[in-house]
């Protein structure tokens, strides 16, 4: 069956919000479930519900859904940070579809889109709780730039002293 990457649209909201919630609940340690629930609510309300503002295509940003037939299997996006930098965001893939090389294809699609938009560098951050993601970015040519302890919640972190790893990758070495 063919897998496609399609630009998110508002009709995708119910399925994508359920996916984001499910994946984050799977990641939540038992002693942080309440904190994760607040994070899920904030992420959906502050980012997904206003995806047109959070990922404006006019400035090179984009949010994609990963589909097979009509089933949404995952999401990923890039947000413009500066004229030269974008941030990889919301790289989520439902567990039943992992291990098939889709994450690599998603990342390659995001990087190629960023290159075509003229961006020089992609940055990202991920919680150390996401061991598979840490390993994936390490293997994908991303350079670790910083490790921090996130004390406050935002739409990028659950807070609660979770350690976050920040990465970068140069997309256009001569750019």
Regions found by a protein language model. Give the residues of each.
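Extreme N-terminal starter segment of soluble prokaryotic enzymes
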Residues: 2-4
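Acetyl-CoA-dependent GNAT
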Residues: 7-89, 94-96, 107-109, 113, ...
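Short polybasic/polar patches that bind polyanions
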Residues: 98, 115, 138
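Nucleotide-sugar-dependent glycosyltransferase donor-binding/catalytic pocket residues
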Residues: 98-99, 129
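Conserved G/P- and acidic residue-centered "switch" motifs that form tight phosphate/ATP-binding loops
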Residues: 101, 118
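C-terminal "cap" of GNAT-fold acetyltransferases
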Residues: 120-123, 127-175
């Amino acid at each position: 069956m063919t897998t496609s990457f399609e630009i998110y649209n508002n009709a995708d909201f119910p399925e994508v919000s359920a996916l984001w919630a499910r994946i984050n609940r799977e990641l939540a340690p038992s002693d942080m479930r309440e904190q994760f629930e607040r994070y899920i609510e904030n992420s959906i309300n502050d980012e997904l519900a206003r995806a047109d503002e959070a990922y404006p295509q006019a400035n090179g940003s984009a949010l994609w859904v990963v589909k097979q037939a009509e089933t949404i299997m995952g999401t990923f996006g890039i947000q413009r940070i500066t004229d030269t930098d974008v941030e990889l965001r919301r790289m989520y893939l439902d567990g039943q579809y992992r291990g098939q090389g889709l994450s690599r294809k998603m990342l390659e699609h995001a990087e190629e889109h960023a290159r075509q938009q003229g961006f020089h560098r992609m940055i990202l951050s991920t919680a150390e709780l996401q061991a598979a993601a840490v390993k994936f970015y390490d293997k994908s040519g991303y350079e670790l730039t910083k490790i921090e302890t996130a004390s406050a919640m935002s739409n990028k972190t659950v807070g609660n002293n979770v350690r976050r790893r920040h990465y970068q990758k140069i997309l256009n070495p001569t750019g």
